[in-house]
A protein has these predicted regions:
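Long, low-complexity, Lys/Arg-enriched
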Residues: 1-141, 162-229
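Elongated alpha-helical scaffolds
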Residues: 142-159
Length: 232
Protein backbone atom coordinates (compact mmCIF):
# COMPACT_ATOMS: atom_id res chain seq x y z
CA UNK A 1 0.00 0.00 0.00
CA UNK A 2 1.25 3.50 -0.84
CA UNK A 3 0.01 7.05 -0.46
CA UNK A 4 0.12 8.49 -3.97
CA UNK A 5 -0.35 12.10 -5.04
CA UNK A 6 -1.65 12.62 -8.58
CA UNK A 7 -1.02 16.24 -9.50
CA UNK A 8 -0.71 18.42 -12.60
CA UNK A 9 2.03 20.93 -13.40
CA UNK A 10 1.35 24.12 -15.35
CA UNK A 11 3.57 26.65 -17.10
CA UNK A 12 3.39 29.39 -14.45
CA UNK A 13 3.53 33.06 -15.41
CA UNK A 14 5.44 34.68 -18.28
CA UNK A 15 8.66 34.30 -16.26
CA UNK A 16 7.99 30.58 -15.70
CA UNK A 17 7.33 31.09 -12.01
CA UNK A 18 4.68 30.17 -9.49
CA UNK A 19 4.39 32.78 -6.77
CA UNK A 20 5.13 31.60 -3.26
CA UNK A 21 1.97 31.16 -1.23
CA UNK A 22 0.92 30.23 2.28
CA UNK A 23 -1.53 27.31 2.31
CA UNK A 24 -3.79 25.96 5.04
CA UNK A 25 -4.67 22.25 5.03
CA UNK A 26 -7.03 21.00 7.73
CA UNK A 27 -5.97 23.82 10.05
CA UNK A 28 -2.22 23.41 9.49
CA UNK A 29 -0.35 26.24 7.74
CA UNK A 30 2.48 25.73 5.25
CA UNK A 31 4.39 28.88 4.36
CA UNK A 32 6.22 30.10 1.23
CA UNK A 33 5.07 27.21 -0.95
CA UNK A 34 5.48 27.30 -4.75
CA UNK A 35 3.87 23.95 -5.49
CA UNK A 36 0.88 22.83 -3.48
CA UNK A 37 2.23 19.31 -3.95
CA UNK A 38 5.00 20.19 -1.47
CA UNK A 39 2.50 21.07 1.25
CA UNK A 40 0.36 18.01 0.48
CA UNK A 41 3.47 15.86 0.69
CA UNK A 42 4.30 17.21 4.13
CA UNK A 43 0.74 17.06 5.42
CA UNK A 44 -0.20 13.57 4.26
CA UNK A 45 3.27 11.96 4.19
CA UNK A 46 3.07 11.04 0.50
CA UNK A 47 5.07 8.01 -0.71
CA UNK A 48 4.96 8.55 -4.48
CA UNK A 49 4.17 11.34 -6.93
CA UNK A 50 2.46 10.89 -10.29
CA UNK A 51 2.80 14.26 -12.03
CA UNK A 52 1.07 15.22 -15.27
CA UNK A 53 1.94 18.04 -17.64
CA UNK A 54 3.03 19.06 -21.13
CA UNK A 55 6.54 19.49 -22.53
CA UNK A 56 6.24 23.18 -21.59
CA UNK A 57 5.29 22.63 -17.94
CA UNK A 58 7.58 23.96 -15.22
CA UNK A 59 9.52 20.75 -14.76
CA UNK A 60 12.73 22.61 -13.95
CA UNK A 61 11.02 24.20 -10.93
CA UNK A 62 9.69 20.82 -9.82
CA UNK A 63 13.27 19.53 -10.01
CA UNK A 64 14.57 22.54 -8.05
CA UNK A 65 11.89 22.27 -5.38
CA UNK A 66 12.28 18.58 -4.60
CA UNK A 67 16.03 18.19 -5.18
CA UNK A 68 16.72 21.07 -2.78
CA UNK A 69 14.71 19.28 -0.11
CA UNK A 70 17.01 16.26 -0.57
CA UNK A 71 20.21 18.33 -0.89
CA UNK A 72 20.78 16.86 -4.35
CA UNK A 73 20.24 20.02 -6.40
CA UNK A 74 22.63 20.55 -9.32
CA UNK A 75 22.74 23.94 -11.06
CA UNK A 76 23.87 22.50 -14.40
CA UNK A 77 21.05 19.97 -14.40
CA UNK A 78 18.55 22.74 -13.67
CA UNK A 79 19.87 25.03 -16.42
CA UNK A 80 20.08 22.24 -19.01
CA UNK A 81 16.52 21.14 -18.28
CA UNK A 82 15.16 24.69 -18.40
CA UNK A 83 16.88 25.34 -21.73
CA UNK A 84 15.53 22.12 -23.24
CA UNK A 85 11.99 23.01 -22.14
CA UNK A 86 12.17 26.58 -23.46
CA UNK A 87 13.60 25.49 -26.81
CA UNK A 88 11.13 22.65 -27.29
CA UNK A 89 8.13 23.46 -29.47
CA UNK A 90 4.57 23.28 -28.22
CA UNK A 91 4.12 20.12 -30.27
CA UNK A 92 7.24 18.42 -28.89
CA UNK A 93 6.58 14.77 -28.16
CA UNK A 94 8.44 14.34 -24.87
CA UNK A 95 11.58 15.54 -23.16
CA UNK A 96 13.89 13.65 -20.82
CA UNK A 97 12.59 14.19 -17.29
CA UNK A 98 14.44 11.38 -15.56
CA UNK A 99 16.22 13.90 -13.30
CA UNK A 100 12.83 15.16 -12.11
CA UNK A 101 11.56 11.65 -11.38
CA UNK A 102 14.74 10.97 -9.42
CA UNK A 103 14.24 14.16 -7.39
CA UNK A 104 10.64 13.18 -6.63
CA UNK A 105 11.72 9.84 -5.20
CA UNK A 106 11.51 6.11 -5.76
CA UNK A 107 8.41 4.93 -7.59
CA UNK A 108 7.38 8.42 -8.74
CA UNK A 109 6.35 8.90 -12.36
CA UNK A 110 5.88 11.77 -14.80
CA UNK A 111 3.29 11.59 -17.58
CA UNK A 112 3.69 14.00 -20.49
CA UNK A 113 0.49 14.85 -22.31
CA UNK A 114 -0.66 17.03 -25.21
CA UNK A 115 -2.62 20.26 -24.97
CA UNK A 116 -5.85 18.46 -25.88
CA UNK A 117 -6.97 20.91 -28.57
CA UNK A 118 -8.43 18.25 -30.89
CA UNK A 119 -9.83 14.75 -30.70
CA UNK A 120 -6.54 13.07 -31.60
CA UNK A 121 -4.76 14.82 -28.72
CA UNK A 122 -7.62 14.05 -26.34
CA UNK A 123 -7.42 10.36 -27.21
CA UNK A 124 -3.63 10.45 -26.81
CA UNK A 125 -4.02 12.01 -23.36
CA UNK A 126 -6.60 9.42 -22.35
CA UNK A 127 -4.19 6.64 -23.31
CA UNK A 128 -1.50 8.27 -21.17
CA UNK A 129 -3.87 8.50 -18.21
CA UNK A 130 -4.83 4.86 -18.59
CA UNK A 131 -1.21 3.90 -17.87
CA UNK A 132 -2.02 4.66 -14.25
CA UNK A 133 -3.88 1.36 -14.14
CA UNK A 134 -0.64 -0.51 -14.81
CA UNK A 135 1.16 0.76 -11.71
CA UNK A 136 -1.58 1.37 -9.16
CA UNK A 137 -1.88 -1.53 -6.73
CA UNK A 138 -4.60 -2.84 -4.46
CA UNK A 139 -4.64 -0.86 -1.23
CA UNK A 140 -3.12 2.31 -2.69
CA UNK A 141 -4.51 5.56 -1.30
CA UNK A 142 -4.89 8.31 -3.90
CA UNK A 143 -4.69 12.05 -3.26
CA UNK A 144 -5.61 14.26 -6.24
CA UNK A 145 -4.39 17.85 -6.58
CA UNK A 146 -6.31 19.84 -9.22
CA UNK A 147 -4.86 23.29 -8.46
CA UNK A 148 -2.54 23.83 -11.42
CA UNK A 149 -2.54 23.31 -15.21
CA UNK A 150 -5.56 22.67 -17.47
CA UNK A 151 -8.95 22.37 -15.79
CA UNK A 152 -9.75 19.54 -18.21
CA UNK A 153 -7.18 17.39 -16.40
CA UNK A 154 -9.51 17.22 -13.42
CA UNK A 155 -12.15 15.53 -15.58
CA UNK A 156 -9.58 13.08 -16.91
CA UNK A 157 -8.51 12.17 -13.39
CA UNK A 158 -12.07 11.58 -12.20
CA UNK A 159 -13.06 9.48 -15.20
CA UNK A 160 -9.90 7.37 -15.35
CA UNK A 161 -9.68 6.68 -11.62
CA UNK A 162 -13.38 5.77 -11.59
CA UNK A 163 -12.72 3.38 -14.49
CA UNK A 164 -9.73 1.84 -12.70
CA UNK A 165 -11.81 1.30 -9.58
CA UNK A 166 -14.96 -0.05 -11.15
CA UNK A 167 -13.96 -1.75 -14.41
CA UNK A 168 -10.38 -2.89 -13.90
CA UNK A 169 -11.43 -3.44 -10.27
CA UNK A 170 -8.30 -2.17 -8.56
CA UNK A 171 -8.93 -1.83 -4.82
CA UNK A 172 -7.74 1.75 -4.57
CA UNK A 173 -9.23 4.47 -2.38
CA UNK A 174 -9.62 8.15 -3.24
CA UNK A 175 -8.63 9.83 0.02
CA UNK A 176 -8.85 13.49 -1.03
CA UNK A 177 -9.47 15.75 -4.02
CA UNK A 178 -7.60 18.94 -3.19
CA UNK A 179 -7.82 22.44 -4.62
CA UNK A 180 -5.69 25.36 -3.45
CA UNK A 181 -7.83 28.51 -3.61
CA UNK A 182 -5.21 30.91 -4.97
CA UNK A 183 -7.95 33.42 -5.83
CA UNK A 184 -8.83 33.80 -2.14
CA UNK A 185 -8.15 37.25 -0.68
CA UNK A 186 -6.86 35.71 2.54
CA UNK A 187 -3.11 35.85 3.12
CA UNK A 188 -3.15 32.12 3.79
CA UNK A 189 -4.94 30.31 0.97
CA UNK A 190 -7.30 27.52 2.05
CA UNK A 191 -6.94 24.09 0.50
CA UNK A 192 -10.40 22.58 0.13
CA UNK A 193 -11.19 18.89 -0.18
CA UNK A 194 -13.61 18.26 -3.04
CA UNK A 195 -13.86 14.55 -2.31
CA UNK A 196 -17.64 14.94 -1.99
CA UNK A 197 -17.82 15.25 -5.80
CA UNK A 198 -16.19 11.86 -6.21
CA UNK A 199 -18.48 10.43 -3.54
CA UNK A 200 -21.48 11.69 -5.51
CA UNK A 201 -20.33 9.65 -8.51
CA UNK A 202 -20.24 6.54 -6.32
CA UNK A 203 -23.71 7.21 -4.89
CA UNK A 204 -25.13 7.82 -8.38
CA UNK A 205 -23.71 4.49 -9.50
CA UNK A 206 -25.19 2.76 -6.47
CA UNK A 207 -28.59 4.37 -6.99
CA UNK A 208 -28.58 3.34 -10.66
CA UNK A 209 -27.77 -0.27 -9.79
CA UNK A 210 -30.56 -0.37 -7.22
CA UNK A 211 -33.12 1.35 -9.45
CA UNK A 212 -32.51 -0.75 -12.57
CA UNK A 213 -31.36 -4.10 -11.20
CA UNK A 214 -32.46 -4.21 -7.56
CA UNK A 215 -28.79 -4.50 -6.59
CA UNK A 216 -28.11 -2.79 -3.26
CA UNK A 217 -24.52 -3.98 -2.75
CA UNK A 218 -22.88 -0.70 -3.76
CA UNK A 219 -25.20 1.42 -1.61
CA UNK A 220 -24.71 -0.92 1.35
CA UNK A 221 -20.94 -0.66 0.94
CA UNK A 222 -21.10 3.13 0.80
CA UNK A 223 -23.30 3.29 3.91
CA UNK A 224 -20.85 1.02 5.74
CA UNK A 225 -17.95 3.31 4.78
CA UNK A 226 -19.81 6.39 6.02
CA UNK A 227 -20.61 4.69 9.33
CA UNK A 228 -16.94 3.77 9.65
CA UNK A 229 -15.86 7.37 9.04
CA UNK A 230 -18.36 8.64 11.60
CA UNK A 231 -16.75 6.48 14.30
CA UNK A 232 -13.15 7.47 13.52
Amino acid sequence: MARILVSSVGVGNENREYRKTNYSIEGNTYENIKFLASAINEHYNIDKFFLIGTSKSMWEEVYSNFSNKKNSYDENTYNDLKEEIILSGENAETIDLSCVEEALGKGSKIYQIKYGINEAELIYNLEIFMKLSEILEDGDEIYIDITHSFRSLSLYMFVVLNYIQNVIDKKIEIKAVLYGMLESKDETKPVVNLEIIYKMIEWIKGANEFKNYGNSYTIADLVEKEIGRAHV
